Amino acid sequence: MGFFDDKQDFLEETFAKYPPEGRRAAIMPLLRRVQQEEGWIRPERIEEIARLVGTTPTEVMGVASFYSYYQFVPTGKYHLQVCATLSCKLAGAEELWDYLTETLGIGPGEVTPDGLFSVQKVECLGSCHTAPVIQVNDEPYVECVTRARLEALLAGLRAGKRLEEIELPGKCGHHVHEVEV
């Protein structure tokens, strides 16, 4: 059975947003649905999406592999994405990465034995003014991350708290600051 076999309403709603000849535009929402429900994108899901939108698995994989959001190996319940671009590096992201991987005992593509955590370095998360930044799953960013904030974040996640329930020491927030224009 395919992933989308029992999701016909979702498919109809998604495809209705695009002209019939533009079904390929639905690649992103279909990938996102798989990622949200399964936590990662299996090769057979790439093939299924390609069939549904009328393209090749190579094209679907090309779209999926462009974005760091999509995972191609199983991830932990909490997938920690550490920004690795210059602003975050200058603000201490490398030291946070080292602490994180040593503390959890895992590297990229690995999951902690309890299934809670996986880690990944990602390119710019777009919050250079609050560097260093970590994103947990698809949640708002954890900004101005220090070792103390990272320790509190890990403890809160281990305790089963939602991101917004975790008290982080120091100043900064859980989200990208919105600027009104």
From Swiss-Prot:
It holds the Pfam family 2Fe-2S_thioredx. It is an enzyme of class 7 (translocase). One of its GO terms (cellular component) is plasma membrane. Disulfide bonds join 144-172. Keywords: 2Fe-2S, Cell membrane, Disulfide bond, Iron, Iron-sulfur, Membrane, Metal-binding, NAD, Quinone, Translocase. The keyword Iron applies. [2Fe-2S] cluster binds at residues 83, 87-88, 124, 128. Its cofactor is [2Fe-2S] cluster. The keyword NAD applies. Its EC number is 7.1.1.-. NDH-1 is composed of 15 different subunits, Nqo1 to Nqo15. The complex has a L-shaped structure, with the hydrophobic arm (subunits Nqo7, Nqo8 and Nqo10 to Nqo14) embedded in the membrane and the hydrophilic peripheral arm (subunits Nqo1 to Nqo6, Nqo9 and Nqo15) protruding into the bacterial cytoplasm. The hydrophilic domain contains all the redox centers. The subunit can be divided into two domains: an N-terminal four-helical bundle (residues 2 to 74) involved in interactions with subunits Nqo1 and Nqo3, and a thioredoxin-like C-terminal domain (residues 75 to 180) that coordinates the binuclear cluster N1a. This is NADH-quinone oxidoreductase subunit 2. It comes from Thermus thermophilus (strain ATCC 27634 / DSM 579 / HB8).
